[in-house]
């Protein structure tokens, strides 16, 4: 058993110099929910704590414990192993110098091992240790969840994680609270469950759980309807998600205090101080943006029921009810062209009366409007300040 912190650091150095050690991108220990009909099917992985480009000492200790219990790390991009009694005992013996300090926010990996040491072998069967060695497309449910946690906890930036194929890996299940239930099992047991009064309350049927089933938001973040935010979304402190027409998909979210009353689709990112009005839609990479992810800058206003399909810079306004798409043509006066060019000195487009939406992508200080008499779509230099109510954020 390791007795001192110096002994611990010496052991870590020794492990990291060994042939079996692989430095991970991310790792963690998860409790898994298994299929009711097929226990080999993993429906969900819950991580009490994840490590993302950090805590390499714990990674070394865990890998040594795996090595000592006969597990060999492969050359794949990820590795998932059962947590056994022997693994826990080995890992705990290496963590001895930190055990008394492992409370509160200190030494979360040690806290996880301490908790696991209180479980028997049958209980440990529902725990997995997961390593990601590179940001490749995930191959397991556990790896998908580890990446979703990285996004939702803010340890990985939005759009920085490879989630290719994740939707196909996750199983479509019925969610009752935090419990996933196989649909086949429900069908096979429907009669008995209903006759006995034990049929569960089904909140949703989806491959992704809700954000709040796994993540504790910042104190000044408000989510008024748990169904409106999917796991894998990222909400910066101060974000408010109202009920009704709001929705935030996975790998999408906010970078600061934002009022969300509309839809932020997959891979869309909204800057601080912006307001996504009631029913407004920011298109995702699969819904009309030619695969280009959309960023909305700071202090923008997307009016109620508007549609935004191009990236916007700071201080932009999209009036209620209009669609700003890549191919939409907007009239611009020569005077407004000069003002917009002054606000965006890097923009080197020559003046013309009509610009397509894609030609205006990423510019700041734009105001999109539809003429109420002619129906003509127009864009001009915004002269309004968008400012959120500080009391609400």
UniProtKB/Swiss-Prot annotation:
Annotated positions binding succinyl-CoA: 263, 278, 281, 304, 319-320, 327, 356, 369-372
GO biological process terms, semicolon-separated: diaminopimelate biosynthetic process; lysine biosynthetic process via diaminopimelate
HAMAP family associated with the record: DapD_type2
Pathway(s) this gene product operates in, as recorded in its UniProt entry: Amino-acid biosynthesis; L-lysine biosynthesis via DAP pathway; LL-2,6-diaminopimelate from (S)-tetrahydrodipicolinate (succinylase route): step 1/3
Database matches in Gene3D superfamilies: 3.30.70.2010, Hexapeptide repeat proteins (2.160.10.10), Trimeric LpxA-like enzymes (3.30.60.70)
Active-site residues annotated for this sequence: 261 (acyl-anhydride intermediate)
Family to which the UniProt record says this protein belongs: Belongs to the type 2 tetrahydrodipicolinate N-succinyltransferase family.
Any single GO CC term annotated in Swiss-Prot or TrEMBL for this entry: cytoplasm
Catalytic activity annotation: (S)-2,3,4,5-tetrahydrodipicolinate + succinyl-CoA + H2O = (S)-2-succinylamino-6-oxoheptanedioate + CoA
Leading EC class: transferase
Entry GO MF terms: 2,3,4,5-tetrahydropyridine-2,6-dicarboxylate N-succinyltransferase activity
Cellular location(s): Cytoplasm
Subunit structure: Homotrimer.
InterPro entries xref list: Hexapep, THDPS_M, THDPS_M_sf, Trimer_LpxA-like_sf, Type2_DapD
Protein name, UniProt field: 2,3,4,5-tetrahydropyridine-2,6-dicarboxylate N-succinyltransferase
Keyword set, alphabetical order: Acyltransferase, Amino-acid biosynthesis, Cytoplasm, Diaminopimelate biosynthesis, Lysine biosynthesis, Transferase
Signal peptide annotation: none
Record EC number: 2.3.1.117
Described purpose of this protein according to its UniProt entry: Catalyzes the conversion of the cyclic tetrahydrodipicolinate (THDP) into the acyclic N-succinyl-L-2-amino-6-oxopimelate using succinyl-CoA.
